[in-house]
Amino acid sequence: MNLKFVGTHLRTLKLGIATLALAITTISAHAQQEEHSNPNVRLGQKALLDGDFRSAASHLEKALPAESKDPNVLYLLGYSQFHNGDYVKAASSFSKVIALDSKNANAYYYKAKANNNLAIAKESKLSLAQKGQLLTSSIDDYTKAIAVNVNDAKLYQNRAIAYRDLGILKGTSGAANYDKVAATDAYNKAIVDYEKVLTYDAARKDIQTEVKKAKVYRDNLK
């Protein structure tokens, strides 16, 4: 597979800069290897490079169970599912990647992000307790990713978001699960992580704003 071709098509995907960088890592690894022997994997890779995540997930699912022990195939499946908004399946796929490759920081990242998205989805029918469990799991996975890649600012930023969301969940006045102490602790930890991000780039106005907002949320707890 031509690396220039891969790079050109990757730039056409409608992804954020951070997620694009994560995708390049895995897809480039595939590109540098011989063409995969499984036709469904090849079709999945092509669909992914074309930005067709739904087709990519369909082809990669068909590659299982034959490729169920290949963390790269499972990663691409989870990545496709994530960008389809199928966060439950994505979290499951990334869990399988982690079981095969416990040092895969990107898998921890996407599993955490998928669970965070599930926890805060407006249409969610999950109980408050289930949402709290998802956010706690998300925080734990970001922490594991940080243990692998301690200097990745994105991991601290996203863990801060998970802490903030946990603070909102626990700190909503009148809610059955209201817990001022837990909410305060979550906001404080979010602030610490946001401030860690600023040590990498002190000029980031968005993070400065998030620090201020987290402090306001914390200080307004009743």
Regions found by a protein language model. Name each.
Residues H36-N38, P71-N72, A105-N106, A153-K154, ...:
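Helix-start (N-cap) detector for alpha-helical repeat units in TPR-like alpha-solenoids
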Residues L49-D50, H83-N84, N117-S124, D165-I168, ...:
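Register position in tetratricopeptide repeats
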